[in-house]
């Protein structure tokens, strides 16, 4: 059975944000059973964990001797067993992969710039000066994303794929603000994707682990 590493507990602002949610969601979409290896704070810095994940992050996926880190790689691995995530059609499959990579490379770095300021440095003078520029940059990317989405329900048209899964989790990083949801098209897109039963099961599973540890 697949095992996913996750934190046993994180502060409330980070709950529903930790990257193991991406792996859990993908597994739920694929209908694959899994179990979690819950880490206490500090476990991620231990030598045995760093041997598997050099950056000390979650999640790690383990299955039959295979160890994978990085949520993008993990979602693609799971997607190999799910036509929902990675369609059989070669073109659609490539586009799903394209959007997954776009979420991680073209959107997430700009989203994280704002999130780090808001969640960790909001009262610092340098952050107050830096935030308007960071918001401007992310809004440019979000505007381009919204334009590409257009009136389609999902990034590649009528079907949800791994690209939508990854993009949604990236956009949710800014759920504490209206930077994303001020765009009605993107707000509706997030609502549509998070209404999926697989997302709800994944989210509830992550939050359930945190509640058990509280």
Named regions from a protein language model:
Residues 6, 166-169, 204:
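Short beta-strand segments
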Residues 103-195:
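GST-like fold's C-terminal all-alpha helical module
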């Amino acid at each position: 059975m697949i095992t996913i590493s996750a934190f046993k507990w994180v502060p409330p602002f980070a709950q529903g944000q930790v990257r193991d949610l991406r792996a859990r969601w993908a597994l739920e979409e694929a209908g694959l059973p899994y179990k979690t290896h819950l880490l206490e704070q500090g476990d991620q810095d231990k030598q045995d964990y760093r041997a598997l994940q050099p950056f000390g992050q979650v999640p790690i996926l383990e299955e039959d001797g295979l160890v994978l880190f990085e949520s993008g790689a993990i979602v693609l691995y799971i997607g190999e067993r799910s036509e929902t995530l990675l369609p059989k059609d070669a073109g659609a499959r490539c586009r799903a992969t394209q959007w997954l990579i776009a979420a991680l490379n073209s959107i997430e770095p700009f989203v994280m710039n704002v999130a780090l300021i808001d969640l960790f440095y909001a009262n610092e003078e340098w952050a107050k000066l830096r935030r308007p520029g960071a918001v401007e940059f992310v809004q440019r990317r979000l505007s381009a994303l919204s334009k590409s989405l257009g009136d389609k329900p999902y990034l590649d048209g009528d079907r949800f794929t791994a690209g939508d899964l990854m993009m949604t989790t990236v956009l949710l990083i800014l759920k504490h603000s209206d930077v994303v949801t001020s765009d009605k098209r993107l707000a509706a897109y997030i609502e549509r994707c998070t209404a999926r039963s697989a997302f709800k099961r994944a989210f509830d599973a992550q939050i359930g682990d945190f509640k058990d540890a509280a």
